[in-house]
UniProtKB/Swiss-Prot annotation:
This is Uncharacterized protein KIAA0930 homolog. It comes from Mus musculus (Mouse). The modification Phosphoserine is found at S268, S276, S279, S304, S306, S324, S358, S362. Residues 319-336 have a biased composition (Basic and acidic residues). Keywords: Phosphoprotein. The keyword Transmembrane does not apply. Pfam families: DUF2045. The modification Phosphothreonine is found at T290, T293. Residues 262-307, 319-340 are annotated as: Disordered.
Amino acid sequence: MLRAIAEERGRLSLRREVCGLGCFKDDRIVFWTWMFSTYFMEKLAPRQDDMLFYVRRKRAYPGNEGTIDGRKAEAEPEVEVEVYRRDSKKLPGLGDPDIDWEESVCLNLILQKLDYMVTCAVCTRADGGDIHIHRKKSQQVFASPSKHPMDSKGEESKMSYPNIFFMIDSFEEVFSDMTVGEGEMVCVELVASDKTNTFQGVIFQGSIRYEALKKVYDNRVSVAARMAQKMSFGFYKYNNMEFVRMKGPQGKGHAEMAVSRVSTGDTSPCGTEDSSPASPMHERVTSFSTPPTPERNNRPAFFSPSLKRKVPRNRIAEMKKSHSANDSEEFFREDDSGADLHNATNLRSRSLSGTGRSLVGSWLKLNRADGNFLLYAHLTYVTLPLHRILTDILEVRQKPILMT
């Protein structure tokens, strides 16, 4: 099936060069309706869903406001995704002119014929450029043409097509041990494969450094909540979770991370991991010449309107900085900052408890910048445009890095 689609796409490119667009439209409809009928209506794999997805393009007719020089401008057709059971009597007829049969085939291919595995890893980079994976977690995910907010359960799903979502509803349980500290970075990789696992292809890779995550988290968290924590000498625990986006290379899709601060009294393994070179978490992977470095994005941050205290100018400037994750121009890209690997080890070995501070010491530290602390980084979803997934599957087929 994949070979037939790739060959048809190749013929399409060739015909465009020879005779231009439109001269072979009927021929293409015949091909794509045959593909739809053969691979989705007649052949039913053991694990295949009994649902069929149709991409319908409704013709839109503009009103008077849609005119240019007295002529009606051609309006973009409205796109809808219709879902039917395979045995439904209301199935659209093969050859229905309002159905985009090519996109319908591609959508059903992505939703039903492929398996997806997402891997989230916490890594550091050595001075020589080698990447060390400290821990990683892989989880099977499923493609969907709809989405729902991850910060509130029970809300209705909304159609997201042509963007395809790969969601992890139980992200806190799945990635419970994904904590990131100073000098570390979070890497995400999404891999597609066919049902027989005869081929694998990376369709998303992204990364974000701890320093960028912490900056976003600090900007998002209410200043009042942090002040209350300091005034209570560490007894007040701010446990807010912030959702941060990580853009893919060249803007190809994005991933979302649920970021929260590790509690100072946390006794989970994330605070007691053995970081010695002999530890299996320091598994050496292949040398990469391009470690991830996120680029800054300036977007307004949340500010609590109830805060009456005058805020210094430098703090106001900080709050105006980015609250979204940065582009990963390449998955592993050379970084000039020279991150120190020992920082991550020292952070995990020292005590994070703030309850032993003296009264005077706490007051003196009120106006100081917060020190580094561990952050939970839970992957919630990855989303990609359908056409980018197809290109990576049919043409690129990049080999996985984190899954090896």
